[in-house]
A protein has these predicted regions:
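Beta-strand-centric surfaces of beta-sandwich/beta-rich domains
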Residues: 3-117, 122-270
């Protein structure tokens, strides 16, 4: 494949005048797809860093044992809202299951489908929910007013103001290779004094450990952003975990958001 990342339309020996990235997004290029992940963490303290960039906060707990997932809201009136949960099944293949909320009641997602990863969920029906929705695995011990315990069982959170997860984490499906194209991060602080944070892109290949791929220093007099486009995209193999993590912050109550873009390529055409 020539000029795969230049924007020219050359795939599998076919050349044209269109934009390759646009055509991938439109689903016109067989075996190629785009993943856009985004997340935020609204409160990171000097005593709690490092933290991952997801609304639930703290470090994300991975469970490599495939398990049934559950869902509940902390609002008892959130009944009948349709939620779609996306992740990977026990074979690390892409899986999407739809479930209806039942208020604060622990509700099984699906009819026995197992998830080894959950990395996105959103309201897919016509009615928005009012509480905060949590998705958690079978390591849960108890659920009180819709909130599971221990917190390490939580695999995703959807806040009412978003109706969509904000979690800058992803796992590459089996049979695919990810190409890390771009990432951006920003920090906010409600005062005018300069603050700073260190962002860390961390990747764990299947069977390995998390390794730091890039550190980005952010500084702010109220807000700051950092954008990086890979001239030569980073190749990430199947079943690898990707997490955007805040390594350190200089002050308490730091808010951080991150986003990254991947191109997924089927291994059969890579």
């Amino acid at each position: 494949v020539a000029n795969k990342y230049t924007g020219s339309n050359e795939v599998g020996g076919t050349s044209g005048s269109g934009n390759l990235f646009l055509e991938i997004s439109q689903g016109k290029v067989s075996g190629y797809s785009v993943v856009h992940k985004f997340g935020r963490n609204d409160e990171i303290d000097t005593a709690t860093d490092p933290e991952d960039v997801w609304t639930y906060g703290g470090l994300y707990t991975y469970n490599d044992t495939p398990s049934i997932q559950y869902i509940s809201s902390d609002n008892a009136l959130d009944i009948g809202m349709e939620i779609t949960v996306e992740g990977l099944d026990e074979n690390y293949e892409e899986q999407s299951v739809t479930v209806l909320l039942n208020g604060q009641t622990q509700t099984q997602i699906g009819t026995g489908e197992l998830f080894v990863r959950v990395f996105r969920a959103f309201t897919s029906g016509p009615i928005a929910f009012a509480g905060n929705v949590l998705i958690y695995d079978d390591t849960v011990v108890s659920v009180t007013l819709g909130v599971p315990s221990p917190s390490t069982s939580v695999k995703a959170e959807i806040r009412a103001e978003d109706q969509q997860t904000y979690m800058a984490l992803y796992t590459v499906p089996a049979g695919k290779t990810a190409y890390f194209m771009q990432h951006s991060s920003d920090i906010t602080k409600p005062n005018s004094s300069a603050q700073n944070a260190v962002m860390d892109i961390r990747v764990r290949e299947f069977g390995g450990v998390f390794r730091s791929k890039q550190l980005d220093g952010l500084t702010t007099d109220g807000s700051s952003s950092f954008d990086f486009v890979f001239t030569l995209p980073e190749m990430i193999p199947e079943k690898s975990d990707i997490r955007m993590q805040v390594r350190t912050v200089s002050t308490n109550d730091m808010g951080v958001s991150s986003t990254f873009v991947l191109i997924l390529v089927d291994n059969s055409v890579a």
